[in-house]
Amino acid sequence: MIEHHPTTIYGTTIVTVRKGNKVVIAGDGQVSLGNTVMKGNARKVRRIGKGNVIAGFAGATADAFTLLERLEAKLEQYPDQLMRASVELAKDWRTDRYLRKLEAMMLVADSKVTLALTGTGDVLEPEHGVMAIGSGGNYALAAARALVDTDKSAEEIARKAMDIAADICIYTNHNIIVESLDAE
């Protein structure tokens, strides 16, 4: 569980949907410092590696960037092996005293697999092709799960889930960034 401190930058919602031949990660743009919105258009979803991996991060911003950089380094070490790179990052996360204190989570996906990298060094695969993290993660997850069996596309589901989360969660806004990849 991520504790909220008034002097730490927090807040976001990230959702991933894998459906049909697409995988999507969507996130909002709000950065909060305590109970103040510091920025509304942050980009917390992006392509990494050679552009064949998409990632979204939630939690303390500086910590999330540290983890993103570490994952990119692991992807260089293990090209086109997202699962292996993520497991190796998780090993480092659990054993490194500095990394263990990082308060962030990430959702990552390539054409084959979607994973959540948690603050405790766990690597999890989603059930039903849907997963969400962050302050509005539970709202986005519930919305996406409700829509995944409809005829909506992965991107439509992710956007609607983010809209619902932004309506409910004060740390999430409607400035939605979406990245997608073709899935196998």
From Swiss-Prot:
GO molecular function, a single term: threonine-type endopeptidase activity
Keyword Hydrolase (UniProt): yes
Keywords: Allosteric enzyme, Cytoplasm, Hydrolase, Metal-binding, Protease, Sodium, Threonine protease
UniProt protein name: ATP-dependent protease subunit HslV
CDD domains hit by this protein: protease_HslV
Ranges in a coiled coil: none
Subunit annotation: A double ring-shaped homohexamer of HslV is capped on each side by a ring-shaped HslU homohexamer. The assembly of the HslU/HslV complex is dependent on binding of ATP.
Primary site of residence: cytoplasm
Notes on how activity is controlled: Allosterically activated by HslU binding.
Gene Ontology cellular component terms for the protein in this record: HslUV protease complex; proteasome core complex
GO biological process, one term: proteolysis involved in protein catabolic process
Pfam families cross-referenced by the UniProt entry: Proteasome
